[in-house]
Amino acid sequence: KVLLFFGMIKKVKGLDVLLHALKDVVKENPDVLLLIAGKAWENDFTNYQRIIDENNLSDYCLLHTKFIPHDEVEHYYCAADLVVLPYKKIYQSGVLVMTLSYGKPALVSNLPPLKEIVTDMQTAFLFESENSISLAEKLNLILLDPEKLEQVRINGEELINTEYDWNEIGRQTKQAYQSLY
């Protein structure tokens, strides 16, 4: 199974939490691969590389730590079985919306802005933010249940194609303006 961490790599995105979780996940799921795709903030991947090295995770990590041009984004999503967003702090997530629009299931931290979009075990999977044990447990649970993974994937794709469809957004915006008069 391929796990995808996608986007700008900053401390608030929680890649360190995911890497610490990965060391426990590979014990039960040695065939898992974490694809890290995105440019490191200020070109500094040092802390993450140290975690990978100290925990012997290099065989389980595929690093594409560079800017990903728009025309290459689809390749990364096509390779992924699950997209992981272990954010520590966030106000909104374009990556979550993009993940669901590509028809991929997402595992996200339980921050309020993310919980406004998805529901645990229905349209995505949630874990306790900044908790690598919670993340590892949820990853192992997901990897053991491919049927649930597929159902959540379908539900997430349906959510994005209905609630976040441009026509629906336009209808809701029009309705909001009309309610002012």
Range-by-range predicted roles:
Residues 120-121, 125-132, 141-147:
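Conserved acidic donor-binding segment of nucleotide-sugar-dependent glycosyltransferases
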Residues 75-91, 104:
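Acidic donor-binding loop of glycosyltransferase active sites
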Residues 134, 141, 148-163, 172-175:
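A short, well-ordered alpha-helix in the C-terminal region of glycosyltransferases
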Residues 46-67, 71:
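Nucleotide-activated donor-binding/catalytic signature segment of Leloir-type glycosyltransferases, i.e.
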